[in-house]
Amino acid sequence: MKLLIADDEILTRNGLVTSIDWKSLGIDQVFEASDGMEAYNTACTSKPDIILSDIRMPRLSGIEFAEKIKEILPDTSLIFMSGYSDKEYLKAAIRLKAITYVEKPLDLQEVKDSVQEAINEHQTRLQTRSSMKLQSKETSSRLAQLLTRPYNEKQEEIDELTDKLSI
């Protein structure tokens, strides 16, 4: 899995990169960005599974960055960090379906727990998608089988399967 850490404070970025054993959490690659625009460009090229982003950053705020990135990477999990408890930031985080909102100064255990929650959500999403694909394949296969038989015998089953497939 890939993680992008976006924060304009170099000490925060370096602290997160060096203080947490990302490999033990299943994070293979960690990317960094020092502002919202760099975060956007990095996310477009690296396609992270999880983004850990500060709210207030130069050039593009964390909220603006997240809104833009959700358009092209809708399955990316968001975790916001901020030293400010502004209600508008919290509303924006909820609207963007962020995993959580971690307050600064950061508690490393809280960050790890948040990332683990994002990993779990990502894996659940992949399993659900895989199950849906399998079910769709099975339904399509069954429909193809029914369509190769005499039509008048299986009209009810054909209708049921076409409804399932929305065709």
Task: Explain the meaning of each model-derived region.
Residues 32-50:
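Acidic, metal-coordinating helix/loop segments flanking the phosphotransfer/catalytic sites
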Residues 41, 63-74:
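Short amphipathic alpha-helix used as the core "switch/output" element in two-component signaling
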Residues 7, 54:
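Active-site residues of response regulator receiver
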Residues 106-167:
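Interdomain helical linkers/hinges and coiled-coil/dimerization scaffolds
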Residues 35-38, 61-64, 82:
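Acidic catalytic/metal-coordinating carboxylates
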Residues 10-31:
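Two-component/phosphorelay signaling modules centered on CheY-like receiver
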Residues 57:
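Receiver (REC) domain active-site loop signature in two-component systems and cognate sites
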